[in-house]
A protein has these predicted regions:
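Intrinsically disordered, low-complexity, charged/polar segments
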Residues: 48-85
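Short, solvent-exposed coil/turn elements at secondary-structure transition points
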Residues: 9, 23, 66-67
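Intrinsically disordered, low-complexity segments enriched in small/polar residues
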Residues: 4, 17-18, 29-31, 76, ...
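Terminus-proximal functional modules
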Residues: 2-5, 26-27, 84
Length: 85
């Protein structure tokens, strides 16, 4: 499995994923797409600790097949297509 940029491709709504952010590390969670959410349409609900994360704070993801152990973090903290400015 390899890390995918959230800005290149999003998981399916309700899909189990691993996600990574520079300030939060690697966690398992579930992606939720809610286009009318006033906070963000792209949210990740953590499976390991109560809380949710926006894709701006965790710009990398990979499919959680339920078998793989915690993956190592990506080689770069931010993908090349991460919005800046």
């Amino acid at each position: 499995m390899e890390w995918i940029s959230f800005f290149e491709r999003q998981p399916e709504d309700g899909q189990g994923i691993w996600y990574y952010g520079e300030h939060i590390g690697v966690w398992a969670g579930e992606y939720s797409y809610s286009p009318n959410d006033p906070f963000s349409p792209h949210l990740i609900f953590c499976h390991e600790s109560p809380g949710l994360v926006d894709r701006m704070d965790a710009p990398w993801w990979m499919v959680d097949d339920g078998v793989m152990n915690r993956p190592i973090k990506p080689a770069k903290d931010y993908p090349d297509d991460y919005p800046s400015g």
